[in-house]
Structures are given as C-alpha cells and as structure tokens.
Amino acid sequence: MGKKQVAPPRALPPMPSLKDEIPLSRSKKKKSKSNNVPDDLLQNAGFNTSENKDPLSPERRKKKKKRLSIDAETSLTQHNPALPVVQNGKDTDNQAAEEGTTRKPRRRTKKTRSVGQEFPNELGVEDEDIIPDGHTKIPEQNPAFLASSLTSQPVGKFFVEKNRRFQAADRSEIIKTTEQTDVFLDVKPTWTSMDVSLTAHHIFRMVGLFCCGFLAGYAVWNIVVVYVLAGSQLTNLPNLLQTYKILAYPSQCFLYFLLVLSTITAFDRIDLERTADALRGLLKLDPAALASFFYFVALILALSQQMTSDRINFYTPPTENGSLWQANTEEQILQPWIVINLVVALLVGLAWLFLSCRPDIDHTEEAMFIPEGEDYPDMEKGTKIQG
C-alpha cells in the first residue's frame, strides 16, 4: 500500500469506420445528352469534342462534423474497441471516407417539345380573318386609286416607246398611220387554199368555154371542107381522098383534143358528186347537163371512126400494088364517115349554144360555197318539229 497507483491518461473513444458500414459509392458515368445538332455542323463550327469521356464530378461540399457527447463517445468505445484513436481532435480516417463518398447531383429532366411547337403555326387562321355571315369586309380604297377610275380627258400628245425611250407624238399622226395600215390590209388580203382553188376553177372554166366555141367552129369548118371536096351527091370521092389524106391525120388529132377538153369543161360545171341531181338536171333540160351529154356522145362517135381516118391517111389508088382500097368501095367506106362527122359538128354546135346562153352556170362552185348545214334545210325543219 506504499505507492499510490497513477491512472493512465484517458483515451478518447475511436470513431466508427465508415469503410466497414457505409459502402463507397461508385462514380457513375453520366449519359451524354442527346443533341439534335448533327456532328457535321459541330465540326464545321469549329467545336472539338473532348477525348475524355468521364463525366465532370460536381464540387465537393464539406460535411459538417457533429461533435459527440462524452457519454456517446464512451459507448462507442465500448461497442467498437477496434476503432482508431483520434489525435489532436482530428479524424484522418473520417476525412478519407468523406473524400471517397460523392454526393449524387440531381438531374433536371427537360421536357421534349414536339416539332409543331418549335415553329409558329404560319398556316393558322387568325380571329381577324374570320368574317361572320351577313357581314362582308369592304376593302378600304385609297383616294389615290380612285382618280384612275374616272374618265380621262383626250390629250393632243401621246408618249410612244421608241428605241427604249418614250417620245411625244401627236394624235393626228398616229391616226394617219393606223388608217394607212387598215388600207394596206384591205388592199392585200390573205389568200386561203379555198380562194386559190376557186380562182383556178374560174380560170379553167373561162379557158374551157373558149375551147368549146373554138371546137364548134372547127367542126363546122371540117364538115364544110369534106362536102366541098366530095362534090354534089358525093360523086367526086376519089378527089376527096387524094386531097384530104394530107389533112386527115392532123385534123382528126386536133379534133379529139378539143373534144376531150370541152367534155371535161362541161362535166366540171355539174356536180358529179351527186349523180341523182345530175340526172335530174338532164331530165329538166339543164344547160350544163345537156352540154356535157352532147360532148360525151360526140367524143364517142369521133373515136368510132378512127380506123377510117387512118385508111384515108394511107390512101393509094386501087390500081397500085399494096393499096388498102379496092375499086368501087370508096362510097361504101366514106359515106358513114361523112355522116358521123356531120353529127359530131351538130352536137358540138348545140352544146356550145347551150353553154353560151348560160356561161355563168356552175353547180360545182355552188356546192363548194354552200355550207353543210344548209344542204338539207327541209330535213332539219322536220327534225325540229318532231322534237
């Protein structure tokens, strides 16, 4: 009992290890926000993306340390005797644990906007544009535009654009130039295909009428020459053969040519498209129809005597060798030929007489001028009455 035991210095209770109780939170990688801007625009704008993909950690906040009471400290040392001793009132282990733990930042979710909300509704209807029934919106007219609706006063000068410049011109000069152009257009009208065809038709009709008159005179001259050379009662037929054999071939060819041309001219005056009307005109003694019929018959009769004309052209006396003529056969061969030439001359003369009485008659031209709607007016009236 000699010595008094000295108590050791009181040791502070160890702090609980945060490593054992609280697990360290691992740093999570932040998801990169979806950016609507394409990468090409970022590269063109000059922004370089960082190579480090780790998210930036938020700033660390110092956590205030709560001081424990003496009773709490003793209780902690009793329950956890393995806790380290705090030196100088500072806990190094706690600081290391605090540095390891990071606080999770709160993320603010952005609401996605629809495409229609990003742009203004340009096609929308405003309230001002809606007009109720019974109310019409009268546009306000500017008084400057009202003056243009008034009647303008005639001015003596006009401004005409010439060579990309406006030059003043008198009204009288412009009226004279317009009158001259109107006269020029009246003098030289435009020709159509119908005008050309009708003009050609008129020219051919005039030429054909002249040929018909010339044919009538030539046929009469031919028959007069034949009767003069044959003598009275056809007693001098050998004289006719010896004299006319030089004229037989050329005269007959010329007669055929005139007959063909006159026949075409006569048929051109009637409308051959309507054969019923042509036959009806022949029965009604139409001059154009009768002339065409006479010319056609004369042409057939003249062609029927072509062989006799050839024998007259090659005439040699019957006494010579190789002669086509036999003795005492001249009258038997020449008498029908003379009669037919006389009939041809009469037919041609009558046809010319009919045409000369009505030279302007032309049913083909009338058919070309009459419109299609006026062809059958009676039938149209009948259909209207039935309707």
From Swiss-Prot:
One Pfam family, short name: TMEM237
An annotated GO cellular component: membrane
Main subcellular localisation: membrane
UniProt keyword annotation of Transmembrane present: yes
GO biological process annotation, one example: cilium assembly
Family: Belongs to the TMEM237 family.
Free-text function comment from the UniProt entry: Component of the transition zone in primary cilia. Required for ciliogenesis.
The protein's name in its UniProt record: Transmembrane protein 237
